[in-house]
């Protein structure tokens, strides 16, 4: 004997392997169901003989054969009733029903079926299926999927039960079919019922046709309305489920533009006519919720206190003067002109210099919400604009998601790594960003999913990039670009002592511990353990030191630390870089120090040249771009045109020899015209056998007439030279105005020369 909760059912017979909805409203039945749900147990379901009996006594009031069923889903109705989807497993014989407190419990045995797979059973099943198919066609109330699913069923018992459950016959007749355990006999009984129902259906159709022909349009409309009303009443009125009621309340209480409200009201109207379990209902519900969650009219008030804003920016960041000035300028204009639209900035510079954290400080200084949109690796336009609702699993794009997250229509929005977007067959996300960042268009930005204009003109957009060359020209044109440069060692020292060390102490529970890292120790840490444009690795190393110190605090109860240079190896291991020493003026033939500007800051660009047997050509290696190759051709032409100034060591040099120029780190692509004078110097050195000073570096574009033209990234390149231990640099005369950007501490330790022509360069670079 088995035991399970028992639920009496009225006017409904449930067959095995059929998912059936039932409505539970009686107090004892609800208590029984709640216990089964809580204990995750199965239910025994049995039909009441008298449906009008509110409280059955179980003394002959319940049929002896029922089913054991699993609970598939529950829906709590507004009237406190519960709608339950159950799936029956087997026929059971109900033995004894008892009432324990407020719940029904029964003992039962599972009924075994007979003649399940005999030839006669197969024959009667085919006959029943053929008749049932005609019955379905005649009635016209069943979906085509019912017949398709029956064709796939190989278990005759299951198929017969499904057909019986769909017959329009009384509960008593269905109960009689349920009680037949002999599958063959059950088939005969169902066949009899189908034949009888087809005869009745045929007569009803004849009568309906006669009646409908006599009905006028008004009567017909009344008939349909009454029929729909009765159906809704029987089904529990789907339009009033909790989710729909909540959505309607939110729509009433949310301030929305007129056109948005009208569209949502139309969508809600559709939703109320749908069953809550339909796929389309879920799509519409998700859409309405997505639109309601957008900040259509929610706006934060700007804090237009320039003094306070300046204090916040200075508190969190050292340097970055231009970016801070730009924000304060904007706040001043906003104070004078409150109707001013948002700003679109782009902070470009090496990684780790504080671009992202600066944007957070901008948001705080303005009193606005901060939200971040990561664009690195985005290749699909739909990630920006969203997917149209016709697609399965569609959703809003990153911009609308960010606006939802912000909760206001004027946040500070960080568009992180805008240079890392790429395109493929799905579209170009950079083109989609044009509408987002165009002040003339973003007032009516239309996400494909939302499908209504949304005003982005109040958003303060700040994009970040490492290399603007990877950003399309139209996109660059829409942004106010601020070029942020690398930090010098002195700036890194200040940042480390004022910000990074304190932050690392706080993060590692050392805020109350006295930790001192003297400047000379910090310089050693910067020079020998980190080589970067920013301070990201420096922060990481300081955190590592703090973790080691935290361990000493726990193990030895140390309260004070004063680090020495030798302690760095103890906490961080061997130095990762050799300390740069001032390069000597001794020269090498064909080896020249150039300067380059990369996405991670300024670096030295070495050029190595030798002559080999050949026919006066220049061979270039080192993964060079077309512009750099052309610079080499220009340099060679200039040298050949000025052989009187730079006489070759061999008069037949260009007949018998070839110059090979190599740029080390061959796996790294190199391009640009700024290595022109560097290449020229290498060619002249090899040609004349003159040694080139190794304590000097240079940058500048060369022309075939020997003029030295201006280049970009002066500050970065000078910092890179200083980092490499070089004390003298040669810059184009036209870049003299750019030296104001070079930190004063570098100017005081380095000698900067300016050249109008290559003659000025040649006077400085060769060992005399």
From Swiss-Prot:
One of its GO terms (biological process) is cellular response to heat. It is found in: Cytoplasm. It comes from the Bacteria. It catalyses: Hydrolysis of proteins in presence of ATP. The active site is at 674, 717. InterPro entries: AAA+_ATPase (IPR003593), ATPase_AAA_core (IPR003959), Lon_bac (IPR027543), Lon_bac/euk-typ (IPR004815), Lon_lid (IPR054594), Lon_proteolytic (IPR008269), Lon_Prtase (IPR027065), Lon_prtase_N (IPR003111). The keyword rRNA-binding does not apply. The keyword Thylakoid does not apply. Homohexamer. Organized in a ring with a central cavity. Belongs to the peptidase S16 family. This is Lon protease. It comes from Fusobacterium nucleatum subsp. nucleatum (strain ATCC 25586 / DSM 15643 / BCRC 10681 / CIP 101130 / JCM 8532 / KCTC 2640 / LMG 13131 / VPI 4355).
């Amino acid at each position: 004997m088995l035991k399970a909760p028992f639920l009496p059912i009225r006017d409904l017979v449930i067959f095995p392997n059929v998912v059936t909805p039932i409505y539970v409203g009686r107090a004892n039945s609800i208590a029984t169901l709640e216990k089964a749900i809580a204990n995750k147990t199965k239910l025994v379901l049995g039909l009441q003989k008298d449906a009008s009996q509110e409280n059955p006594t179980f003394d002959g009031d319940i049929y002896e054969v029922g089913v054991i069923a699993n609970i598939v889903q529950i829906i709590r109705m507004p009237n406190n009733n519960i709608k339950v989807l159950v799936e029956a497993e087997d026929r059971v014989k109900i033995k004894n029903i008892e009432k324990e407190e407020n719940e029904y419990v029964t003992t039962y045995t599972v009924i075994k079926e007979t003649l399940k797979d005999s030839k006669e059973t197969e024959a009667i099943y085919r006959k029943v299926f053929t008749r049932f198919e005609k019955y379905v066609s005649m009635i016209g109330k069943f979906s085509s999927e019912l017949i398709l699913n029956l064709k796939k069923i190989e278990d005759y018992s299951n198929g017969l039960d499904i057909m019986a459950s769909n017959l329009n016959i009384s509960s008593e007749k269905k109960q009689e079919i349920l009680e037949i355990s002999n599958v063959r006999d059950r088939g005969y009984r169902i066949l009899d019922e189908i034949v009888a129902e087809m005869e009745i259906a045929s007569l009803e159709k004849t009568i309906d046709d006669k009646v409908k022909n006599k009905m006028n349009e008004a009567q017909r409309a009344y008939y349909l309305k009454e029929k729909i009303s009765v159906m809704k009443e029987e089904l529990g009125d789907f339009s009033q489920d909790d989710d729909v009621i909540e959505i309607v309340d939110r729509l009433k209480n949310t301030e929305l533009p007129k056109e948005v409200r009208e569209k949502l009201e139309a969508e809600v109207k559709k939703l109320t006519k749908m069953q809550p379990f339909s796929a389309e209902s879920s799509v519409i519900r998700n859409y309405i919720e997505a639109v309601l969650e957008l900040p259509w009219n929610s706006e934060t008030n700007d804090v237009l206190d320039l003094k306070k804003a300046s204090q916040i920016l200075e508190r969190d960041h050292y340097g970055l003067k231009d970016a801070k000035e730009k924000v304060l300028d904007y706040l001043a204009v906003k104070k004078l002109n409150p109707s001013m639209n948002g700003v679109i900035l782009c902070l470009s510079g090496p990684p780790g210099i504080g671009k992202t954290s600066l944007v957070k400080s901008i948001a705080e200084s303005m009193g606005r919400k901060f939200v971040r949109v990561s664009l690195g690796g985005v290749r699909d336009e739909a990630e920006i604009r969203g997917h149209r609702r016709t697609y399965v699993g569609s959703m809003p794009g990153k911009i609308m998601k960010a606006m939802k997250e912000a909760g206001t229509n004027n946040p500070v929005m960080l568009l992180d790594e805008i240079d890392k977007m790429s395109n493929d067959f799905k579209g170009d996300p950079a083109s989609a960003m044009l509408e987002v960042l165009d002040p003339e268009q973003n007032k009516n930005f239309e996400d494909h999913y939302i499908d209504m204009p949304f005003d982005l003109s109040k958003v303060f957009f700040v994009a970040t990039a490492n290399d603007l060359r990877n950003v399309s020209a139209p996109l660059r044109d829409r942004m106010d670009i601020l070029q942020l440069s690398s930090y010098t060692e002195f700036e890194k020292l200040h940042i480390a002592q004022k910000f990074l060390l304190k932050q690392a102490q706080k993060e590692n529970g050392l805020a109350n511990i006295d930790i001192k890292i003297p400047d000379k120790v910090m310089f050693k840490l910067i020079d020998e353990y980190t080589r970067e444009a920013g301070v990201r690795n420096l922060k990481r190393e300081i955190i590592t030191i703090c973790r080691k110190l935290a361990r000493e605090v726990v193990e030895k109860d140390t309260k004070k630390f004063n680090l020495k240079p030798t302690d760095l190896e103890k906490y961080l291991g061997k130095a990762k870089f050799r300390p740069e020493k001032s390069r000597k003026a001794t020269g090498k033939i064909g080896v020249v120090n150039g300067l380059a500007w990369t996405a991670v800051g300024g670096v030295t660009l070495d050029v190595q040249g030798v002559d080999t047997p050949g026919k006066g050509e220049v061979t270039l290696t080192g993964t060079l771009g077309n512009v750099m190759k052309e610079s080499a051709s220009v340099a060679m032409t200039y040298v050949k045109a000025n052989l009187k100034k730079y006489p070759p060591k061999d008069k037949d040099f260009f007949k018998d020899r070839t110059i090979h120029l190599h740029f080390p780190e061959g796996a790294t692509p190199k391009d640009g015209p700024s290595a022109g004078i560097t290449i020229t110097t290498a060619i002249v050195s090899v040609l004349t056998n003159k040694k080139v000073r190794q304590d000097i570096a240079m940058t500048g574009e060369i022309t075939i007439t020997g003029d030295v033209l201006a280049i970009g990234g002066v500050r970065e390149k000078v910092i890179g030279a200083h980092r490499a231990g070089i004390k003298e640099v040669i810059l184009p005369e036209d870049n003299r105005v750019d030296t104001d950007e070079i930190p004063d501490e570098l100017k005081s330790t380095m000698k900067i020369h300016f050249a109008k022509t290559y003659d000025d360069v040649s006077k400085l670079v060769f060992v005399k």
